[in-house]
Amino acid sequence: MSLKEEVESRKTFAIISHPDAGKTTLTEKLLYFSGAIREAGTVKGKKTGKFATSDWMKVEQERGISVTSSVMQFDYDDYKINILDTPGHEDFSEDTYRTLMAVDSAVMVIDCAKGIEPQTLKLFKVCRMRGIPIFTFINKLDRVGKEPFELLDEIEETLNIDTYPMNWPIGMGQNFFGIIDRDSKSIEPFRDEENVLHLNDDYELQEEHAIRNDSAFAQAIEEFMLVKEAGEEFDNDALLNGELTPVFFGSALANFGVQNFLNAYVDHAPMPNARQTNEEVEVSPFDDEFSGFIFKIQANMDPKHRDRIAFMRVVSGAFERGMDVTLQRTSKKQKITRSTSFMADDKETVNHAVAGDIIGLYDTGNYQIGDTLVGGKQKYSFQDLPQFTPEIFMKVSAKNVMKQKHFHKGIEQLVQEGAIQYYKTLHTNQIILGAVGQLQFEVFEHRMKNEYNVDVVMEPVGRKIARWIENEDDIQDKMNTSRSILVKDRYDNFVFLFENEFATRWFEEKFPEIKLYSLL
């Protein structure tokens, strides 16, 4: 198979949603239908002892939530699919944002009872900013929810995107009978004991069935015909341009509508895209020279070995295990001998990968999030990945002073993951950690105890705003006050931590020569 044919067979996407919309469950069922796993677990499995394949971390299994992006690869038909299940919780949106930099399309999961929720809206905006095509899966049709037209209107009005229903539900909740498939004009029943039914060209039922006289069926047919008459033919270019989202109705937990979605996804989703660099060079996935970038680092995927994996998206050329690459940030060459693919925490050695593939590189501390790797003499670096400005800050120390070595190792590795941000006071070297939300600190504390055997003491700093400094040479000691604590971040940049907006404005008025800025 040629490089071009290999690249064209890749599909790489992330699943995004508000917490509890069914994102991780959908991931499980996609793996199940592809044959990648024999049994689909469920995130509700805290009581049963069964956990989602993508929720591999201990804290995820205990809480039944996703707090880190999982990477999984599987084959389906003639395609190789890379799927990234992202954290739904808003406190971990930075990890999700970085993950969205590594995919070519996204699947938006919506709870039919709740519609568009805040986290869904935030993540959709990132996809739109990046020009990522979006597929929509409206979930939990076997429960009572909003009417289909109401959901479509909400998507179109809130997200400013056209919708194209690929199927249409018959009933809802306890009266949910199934879905009408738009292309085949067939009815897929929700219950296994029912057979597939077919519609003729006039959308009349061809088989004899009791549902023929059901009011829910009559209403669904009427709505379906309105959709057909009002809508145009499916426009794949509009999808790829982010102007239209194909909509699928189903129930991930019940294994219903998932395979229909997967079949349509591989038909319509884009192949790997070209990538922009800081030097304004566009790198084609078909370029012969290998290139890739690190978008995620994860420590302790195997707690027994304290390993560290750097996740790399291949952008161009072919990766071969054992090849020499250059880390652009340091200009140092290295031979990559340990590379792996994933089914959550299950790993398999990767000898070959092409554009669109996500592979794990064993990391001894060489890599940082955003690093560019190249196989030839390329001089470019891919565009930087987003970093958020924290809103909560805590002083952190080890409860047991004899555990300092483990404490500092844990801090170093979890900070390098991007799970939490690191600061240090100038004169006392007090460690201060910053996070977007409180749950990040809870997960940090849990992981320090379970992965590094260190109990930590955390104390609020009383600061809510971090601002970086453009002109660091103008900083003076008198600026380090009770209202404006001066610290350094992990890259040795100066940062002021302020109590509130009032303190920030007071500082800017008192020291107008200092130019402050925030991250995302």
Swiss-Prot record:
Keywords annotated in UniProt: Cytoplasm, GTP-binding, Nucleotide-binding, Protein biosynthesis
Cited Gene3D superfamilies: P-loop containing nucleotide triphosphate hydrolases, Peptide chain release factor 3, domain III, Translation factors
A GO molecular function held by the record: translation release factor activity, codon nonspecific
Any Gene Ontology CC annotation: cytosol
Stored PROSITE patterns: G_TR_1, G_TR_2
Name of the protein described by the UniProt record: Peptide chain release factor 3
GO BP, sorted A to Z: regulation of translational termination
Xref: InterPro entries: EF-G-like_DII, EFG_III/V, G_TR_CS, P-loop_NTPase, PrfC, RF3_C, RF3_dom_3_sf, RF3_GTP-bd
Organism: Staphylococcus haemolyticus (strain JCSC1435)
Lineage of producing organism: Bacteria, Bacillati, Bacillota, Bacilli, Bacillales
Physiological role: Increases the formation of ribosomal termination complexes and stimulates activities of RF-1 and RF-2. It binds guanine nucleotides and has strong preference for UGA stop codons. It may interact directly with the ribosome. The stimulation of RF-1 and RF-2 is significantly reduced by GTP and GDP, but not by GMP.
Subcellular location: Cytoplasm
Residues the record lists as binding GTP: 17-24, 85-89, 139-142
Domain tr-type G: 8-277
Primary location class: cytoplasm
